[in-house]
Amino acid sequence: MQISSLSPPEIVAVLPAAGNGSRMQNDRPKQYLTIGNDATGHKTILEHTIDALLRHSRVQRVVVVISPDDTFFHTLAIANDPRICAVTGGKLRADSVLAGLAVVADSAWALVHDAARPCLHQDDLTRLLAIVEQSDVGGILAAPVRDTMKRSTDGFIDRTVERNDLWHALTPQLFPAALLKQCLQRALQDGVAVTDEASALEYCGYRPQIISGRSDNIKVTRPEDLALAEFYLTRLQ
């Protein structure tokens, strides 16, 4: 559906960063681990992620959703940037995103991005943001599945899954703030597991658009991801 507007809507990024990243086996949440080199800058993963968002002229603000017991965010230089604010999140990702949306105008579009996904390419972001001019539902970055996919229930292969129509959901995911808020609230109220923002819209009957994104837009989840993220960051410079 084509939508028209006298002026482009505000784009506000929401970063759920309240998780503890236990799989990293570190003394701090993964988003506060430092990566980079002289070319990219020695910064936390969160800082690299925020830099990638604010580098784009269409992204006006970033809302970082942190844990109630977070002791790291306010020690970072970015905490003093007037374009960035921090709010307290909840136990579930959906709770944290809703906390971020509470400070986003309903007329804005919410660009939800994983705090530990620092290798976002500007071309991908530009193509995703173009959805604002074409849709009233929104969409996500995703990468086509290239590996052979197996289904297993007990450690043994049950069958091979057809991969032609399978996509790896990435972030950012972009939706009208009011619509995303409504869908997240309904999904939570109904006890539906929300693994990403698009799944909340799907539950409410919407079909977000898929924008093919780069596979190097990785999420840092395990210790071995750190070196790969540093490599990809260097290539983005």
From Swiss-Prot:
Catalyzes the formation of 4-diphosphocytidyl-2-C-methyl-D-erythritol from CTP and 2-C-methyl-D-erythritol 4-phosphate (MEP). Keywords: Isoprene biosynthesis, Nucleotidyltransferase, Transferase. HAMAP family: IspD. InterPro entries: IspD (IPR001228), IspD/TarI (IPR034683), IspD/TarI_cytidylyltransf_bact (IPR050088), Nucleotide-diphossugar_trans (IPR029044). One of its GO terms (biological process) is isopentenyl diphosphate biosynthetic process, methylerythritol 4-phosphate pathway. This is 2-C-methyl-D-erythritol 4-phosphate cytidylyltransferase. It catalyses: 2-C-methyl-D-erythritol 4-phosphate + CTP + H(+) = 4-CDP-2-C-methyl-D-erythritol + diphosphate. GO terms for molecular function: 2-C-methyl-D-erythritol 4-phosphate cytidylyltransferase activity. Homodimer.
